[in-house]
Structures are given as C-alpha cells and as structure tokens.
Amino acid sequence: KNKAWLNIEYILFDEAQLSDEKSTRGIYFDSIVRRALKVFPNAKFIFAHPFISNPQAQLKKNNIELDESTFSRQYKQKNVGQVFYTHNPKSGEFCHFGTNKKIFGEHKLPSSFDPIEQSLKNGGSVLVYATKAQILDKRIFQRFSRYFDLCPIVTDPEALELIEKLREYIGASKNNTDYYNSYMIDNLMHGIVSHHGSIPLTARLILEHFTQKGFCKFCFATSTLEQGINMPFDIVYIDRFEASKSLSVKNLIGRAGRSTTNKVFDIGSVIVHTSAMTSLRKTLLKNEPISEVSHLDIKDEKIDETYQEFKDAIINGTFNDEYNLTEMDVEKIKSDEIKLLIPTLLDMLFVDDNIINAEEITYEIKEIFHNLYETYLGRPLVVSEKSVLSEAIKIMLWKVTGRTFKNICQLRYARVAQVNERRKHPERAASIPAKYMVGYNEIPNKNLPNHPKIPDTILAKKVDYDTVVFDTYDFLDKMIGFKLSDIYYAIFREYYLDSNDERSLRMANYVKFGTTDTTEIWMLKYGFTFEEIEWLKPHVKSIDEQEICFRNSVNELKDSQKELIEKFFY
C-alpha cells in the first residue's frame, strides 16, 4: 500500500528455501514474492538459499522469464574445519568417524575423552539441536544435566544485566520459586540458553546477544537457529537427526567452529547419535533441490478453504493490500449482519467515550467478537476452534485495554496456577488443582482436536510459568498479530467509513496497534515495542513516514538505549 512513495531497486529474499515448506508458511512466502513482483516490476529480485542445487527453480515457480537479465548459480558446500563424533547415549561412549569413507576409512575410533566435557572445561560452548517438545517438557535438560556442574553461576555484570532485562520483560519472579518462577531464567544464570520459535522475539534477541557476548555455555535449540542468526558454537550436538530435513542438518553443521575472531585454528565438532552416522554421511553428499512449482499453484485438499481463497486472490490479483485480506473477505466484513453487531459492541466497549478496562470485559463482548469472526469466515466454528478463538480474543482485549506482554502472562498464569487460591489457603496450597488452559493452535482448522495446553488434572503448583509465557507469545504473534488484528481492524475501519462513528476508528487502531496515539502508532511502524516506547516517546520531537526527529535529551539515555536508536541518526 506504500508503493507510491517507495523507490526500490533491489529486493533480497534470504532463506528462500522457505518457499518449499509444506505448510501455510510456504504459501505466505510465495505470496509475498508474487505480490512484490507485481508491485515492483523494475526491481532486481535476489533469492538466497544455502546448499540448494537448483536455484533457478525460484525463477520458474514465480513465472520470471529466463533471459539474459536472469542468473542463477549454486555455490557448493565447503567444509570450514570440523571433526565428527558419534555418541552412544546408553554407554556414554564417543567415537571419531570420517564423513568420507574413502578418505577416512570405514571404522570409527573410540575417543579417549568426552568432547563436550573438554569443550566446557576449556571455556567453549555447546549447541544441542532438539525437538521443541523435549525443550518444553525439559526431557532434554535432564539428559544433559551431568554437564551442568561445568556451567558455574554467571557473575559478569553485563550478563546479569541481560538476564534481568529478560526477567523483567517476561514478568518472572526473583527469589520466589512458588509463583511466576522461570526455569528459563534459572538456567540462564548458569549460561544455559533455550531457543525456539515460541520464545518472544524481544526475548530471543536478548538471548542471542547473551550468546554472541560469550556468556552461553549450553544452548538447546530447535530449527529457529538454522537460519541466519550469527551464533557459532564450538560443538553442535544433533540430538534430533532428521534425514528428511537434510538442509537443516547442513545449516546446523555450519554453526560448529569459528566461535571467535581470534587468529587460531578453532576447529568445530559435530556430534550425532551412533545410529545416525550413515545417514549423516549420505546427507552431506545429497543434492538439495526445491520444487519448480509454487504452493500457490498446487491444489491442496487438506488445507482449510480460507487458505485456498487466499491463494486464488494472490493469483487473480484480488488481494487487498490495505487490509491484508482478500477482496472476498472485505466484502464479507461489509455485510449487514456485521453492521448490526458493531454498534452494540461499541456501546459495550466504550463508557463515556473511554474504552473499558480489562476487568470490565464481559462474556457478551467476547461472543460478539466470535460472531464477527464467524461472519468473516463464512461458517460456524467447531468446538475446538471456538475454544482457541475465545482465548485469543481474551488476550487481544487485554492488549487493547493496555496490558503489557508480562501483564498478560501473569494474568494467565495467576488463573491457571490458582495463585490467589493458593495464597489464601496455604494449608492446602500443595493439593489445589490447576485450571484448564486452552493453548495456541492455528485456526481455521475444522479438524483441530480439542485438548488443553495445561489440563486441570495436574496440581496448580506444577504449572510451569515458561509454558504460559511461550503460549501467550504464540497467541500474540502467530494468531493475533498475524491474522486477527487484520480482520478486526478491517471490520472496525470499514464500519467507521460507513457510519463515521469515531469510536469504531479508535477501536480499529486499538486492535491493530494497541493505541490510538498517533506518535505511538508511528513508533510501532518504525519497529519499536511498547516497552521501548515507554522510555523513548518523551524524546521524540516529531515522527511521520519521512523521518523521526529526536530531542537533544536523547543524549541523556543509557548507552544500551542509544544503541537501539543509533540507526536513525544521519
């Protein structure tokens, strides 16, 4: 929608192999490419993907003519200096082996030392690639716990400052193991990092900074660490070896070694289970082609019809850039049914022209939001979808009425962990059951099973605060930020255009941006979070689509705060 004032010469699609993901993520990636090609036909498009053997496939799948103006090249994988080990978790034995049998021989040789132990004793760092489920249920930590004695408590002031910054952001307790205690923070005090897609982006950036500064000893990560982030380790332990995801394996191997900028031969080590040795050898020799057919051009009966409508809109050029919705969706939200619901909803949401607070959100308000979504969707929700949407609407309305991320996490935890009840009745606090909590799941999905994130069959004291934090982020980022905010923004804005009811415009901005303050909206568009806006806004003199001008008082900010805004100075 900003194409009129954008003069773009180059567009780089990094990690472009995402276009091959067999999920909605792959569909969205391809849709961005197609939309960009249409809007910026004179720009040069660059697709970068590691190890891909047929990079020209991106040109074919996006209908880019193969002529003298197009070019593709495969850069062969080069080994940057690594040694390889197998590990037998049952016996604890480590063995050396060669990735090329012709050069190194067919037999593995027992190692006279434990490479993980040696690395940690020498001040090195270890990346363990594991499943998200194993990180969340802590099984992976238990398996490597014998090494944690080699990870002493962090004492560096800069490291402690980063840990406190993270603690404050997620709202975790300090010196209180009964309530709001974060296992992630406790681990971080020993240089043990968790990294996965449900960790909030702000928290992830803190963790990456913590690692880049050399404070990380152990990092337990999922595929979120495969792509792009400059976080090298001395050892990469591939606990989750998936031969079907050979590209992921190659990306991970590239993280072993070069962990410092010192002019030394810092060889990296790669460790796999003994059973994965043959698969690893095959993986390193395997070609990595991507499909020459876009997800947009494939009919998939398994996905919800909403996604098929989205694909059709991209192909037919009927996607509305103003709302990030299809034109068919926009027509749905202009319906008389929605026009009848909105006035009642606005009367409930605003009292004396002020938006209600979080405690005043009623069941009736949430039901109208349900009805609006079902009208947009064009069908009733199944029970499991409705449960997920109910939780999402509650979180969205908390955000709209001024709750920060940590506030929302604490509210959800307080309910599911029965905090008030346990504090009120300390004599039976240990036996009080948890409350049922619905977790994030992608909707629409008519086949979604109906099961909780946290069941009411466990004890309240056993509720894990980190689980609530991660699930809250999934709702805010993957559902509210990525989908619901666009839908409800369009509904309220269209009603405002039709009725001129200022409350509807305010509600549209609350849903989309979490504020109606023009300066704050622009600051959000510039990429600042609400936590950053809180301390930075007084120093903003003016802001619009052209530039952001700061007052001289920015010189009084902390160095860490100045670093955040230095890119805006020229």
Identify the residue ranges that each predicted region occupies.
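Conserved C-terminal RecA-like helicase domain
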Residues: 1-4, 77, 113-218, 233, ...
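SF2 helicase catalytic motif II
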Residues: 2-39
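A short beta-strand element within the Helicase C-terminal
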Residues: 8-10, 218-241, 268-271
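Catalytic acidic motif of RecA-like/P-loop NTPases
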Residues: 16-23, 193, 226, 242
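Conserved interdomain linker/interface between the two RecA-like ATPase lobes of SF2 helicase motors
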Residues: 34, 42-151
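Conserved segment of the helicase C-terminal RecA-like domain
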Residues: 40-43, 246-289
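C-terminal accessory/interaction regions of large nucleic acid-associated machines
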Residues: 243, 311-570
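Long, hydrophobic alpha-helical segments
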Residues: 275-334
